[in-house]
């Protein structure tokens, strides 16, 4: 049986230093139409502790996550990024997230809203 999300953690010397989540069920993701289905996972919640940023730890976790999802039978992964986050967009493009799927608006529990661009990548088998 498949869960609704799959967390990934980067651990160094017993300490979680980075994390990401693969959303496997659209019922827990905003704007999920076209982003999540039985063969597509939506990637979110990317975090790295500041003192470990820029050292390649998250890249290693990200590559592992993509390979693991491919091995689990997923054919595509998607993610969202705010349009002004140009540095992150360049990183995602580098990883092959070049298919623009759609634009949308996401909201937080406090009422804050953000514009988001959604991109996809095919996982090669």
Which role does the model predict for each range below?
Residues 5-9, 19, 45, 78, ...:
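Short hydrophobic/aromatic beta-strand element in the GNAT-like acyltransferase core
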Residues 9, 15-26, 30-31, 42, ...:
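Conserved beta-strand in the GNAT
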Residues 26-33, 102-108:
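A short, acidic/glycine-rich surface segment
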Residues 48, 54-67, 93-94:
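Conserved acetyl-CoA-binding loop-helix of GNAT-fold acetyltransferases
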Residues 69-81:
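Conserved GNAT acetyl-CoA-binding A-motif
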Residues 79-89, 106-110:
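Conserved beta-strand-loop-alpha-helix junction that forms the acyl-donor binding cleft
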Residues 92-102:
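Conserved acetyl-CoA-binding loop of GNAT-fold acetyltransferases
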């Amino acid at each position: 049986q498949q869960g609704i999300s799959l967390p990934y953690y980067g651990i160094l010397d017993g300490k979680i230093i980075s994390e990401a989540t693969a959303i496997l069920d659209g019922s827990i993701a905003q704007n999920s139409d076209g982003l999540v289905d039985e063969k597509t996972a939506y990637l979110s919640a990317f975090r790295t502790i500041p003192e470990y940023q820029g050292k390649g730890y998250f890249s290693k976790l990200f590559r592992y996550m993509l390979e693991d999802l491919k091995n689990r039978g997923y054919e595509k992964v998607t993610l969202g990024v705010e349009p002004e986050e140009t540095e992150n967009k360049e990183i995602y493009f580098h990883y092959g997230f070049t298919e623009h799927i759609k634009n949308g608006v996401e909201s937080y529990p406090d009422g804050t809203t953000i514009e988001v661009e959604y991109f996809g990548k095919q996982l090669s088998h």
